[in-house]
């Protein structure tokens, strides 16, 4: 899993606990090992200290620290560049995307899909402002861009290693993850 974080000191350990609970409950169905790659995007709170602590505490956790905030896209690409697994899944640590969806994504992968997008069907927990800004963003973007974005599809997706390798081979220096699919 690729986990970009910025000032997430309050959510990191909770995410790890929830992920381990999910993994241990579904280990019989999930035939894969895992790695958690946290990318600290220049956090100004205690995120760096917490990540250093969990790095030493857990075997399957790797941590990258940016010297300043470079933005989520750069954090995602740093995570892709450092991932060693055959399946890569970016996800936010705030758990707005439910972990159980990973099982469904893995099922699609086993059916032969190289990329599996997760789409939010329920935004009831989002504030009015969040819902409205997301709606405006997708409407505006899709009016001006050649490649359309599927509304309510974020960075939570499964990508096969060969897809990630092709992304990493792109010569662009301003990649927009959602715009690639």
What does each model-found stretch correspond to?
Residues 1-3, 12, 19, 34-39:
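Hydrophobic targeting segments
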Residues 37-49, 95-96:
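A conserved acidic beta->alpha catalytic loop
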Residues 8-27:
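Short, well-formed alpha-helical segments that are part of the catalytic scaffolds
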Residues 27, 34-37, 48-82, 119:
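Conserved donor nucleotide-binding strand/loop of the catalytic core
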Residues 8-11, 43, 98:
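Donor nucleotide-sugar binding loop of glycosyltransferases
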Residues 64-68, 72-82, 99-180:
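Acceptor/aglycone-binding surface of glycosyltransferases and processive sugar-polymer synthases
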Residues 88:
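Short aromatic/hydrophobic "clamp" motif used to bind/position activated sugar donors
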Residues 66, 91-93:
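Catalytic metal- and UDP-sugar-binding loop of GT-A-like glycosyltransferases, i.e.
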């Amino acid at each position: 899993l690729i986990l970009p974080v910025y000032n997430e000191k309050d959510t990191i350990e909770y995410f790890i606990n929830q992920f381990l609970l999910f993994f241990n409950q579904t280990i019989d169905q999930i035939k894969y090992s895992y790695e958690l790659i946290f990318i600290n995007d220049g956090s100004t709170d205690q995120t760096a200290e917490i990540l250093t602590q969990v790095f030493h505490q857990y075997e399957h956790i790797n941590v990258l620290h940016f010297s300043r905030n470079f933005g989520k896209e750069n954090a995602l690409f740093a995570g892709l560049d450092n991932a060693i697994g055959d399946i890569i899944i970016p996800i936010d640590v705030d758990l707005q995307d439910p972990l159980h969806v990973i099982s469904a994504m893995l099922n699609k992968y086993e059916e032969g899909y190289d990329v599996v997008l997760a789409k939010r069907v329920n935004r009831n927990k989002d504030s009015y402002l969040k819902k409205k800004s997301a709606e405006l963003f997708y409407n505006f973007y899709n009016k001006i861009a050649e490649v359309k974005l599927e509304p309510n599809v974020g960075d939570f997706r499964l990508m096969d290693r060969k897809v990630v390798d092709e992304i990493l081979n792109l010569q662009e220096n301003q990649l927009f993850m959602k715009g690639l699919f």
